[in-house]
């Protein structure tokens, strides 16, 4: 493809990255708020499922919270930076970080499935499979369809 002419699909991929990065930031803020209220959430008016979810989060521990927080920041930054790289068609910033995002996201989804209690999304469920779709699609598109569209 001629330099300066960005494929529409690559632009769409960048927009999706920005949307997912923003969504991740909102989730990160929710995670921080949840951590701030650990132990202060009244559960007497909740049903058993909600109580189990709150208790699972409260029993998660600080190290698990830090792990989730770090993964969220890393994923969000990779999405944002690779999205910018897609728009500028930069090899390292777009293609490179996009591939890193795909690999990190797949690995973190698998680790999360094993580490988290079922009450808070652990185990291989439909949400795990849905969470794997975008990173896999990203890897496939970057290494086939858009492989030649990145410069310097």
Regions found by a protein language model. Give the residues of each.
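Topology signature of small-to-medium multi-pass alpha-helical membrane proteins
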Residues: 2-152
């Amino acid at each position: 493809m001629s330099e300066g002419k960005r494929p529409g699909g690559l632009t769409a991929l960048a927009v999706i990255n920005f949307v997912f990065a923003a969504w991740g930031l909102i989730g990160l803020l929710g995670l921080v708020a949840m951590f701030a209220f650990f132990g202060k959430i009244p559960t007497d008016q909740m049903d058993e499922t909600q109580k189990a979810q709150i208790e699972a989060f409260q029993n998660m521990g600080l190290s698990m919270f830090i792990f989730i927080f770090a993964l969220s920041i890393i994923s969000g930054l990779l999405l944002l930076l690779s999205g910018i790289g897609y728009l500028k068609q930069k090899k390292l910033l777009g293609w490179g970080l996009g591939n890193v995002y795909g690999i990190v996201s797949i690995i973190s989804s698998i680790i999360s499935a094993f580490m988290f209690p079922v009450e808070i999304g652990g185990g291989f469920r439909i949400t795990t499979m849905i969470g794997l779709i975008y990173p896999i699609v990203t890897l496939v598109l970057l290494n086939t369809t858009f492989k030649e569209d990145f410069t310097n």
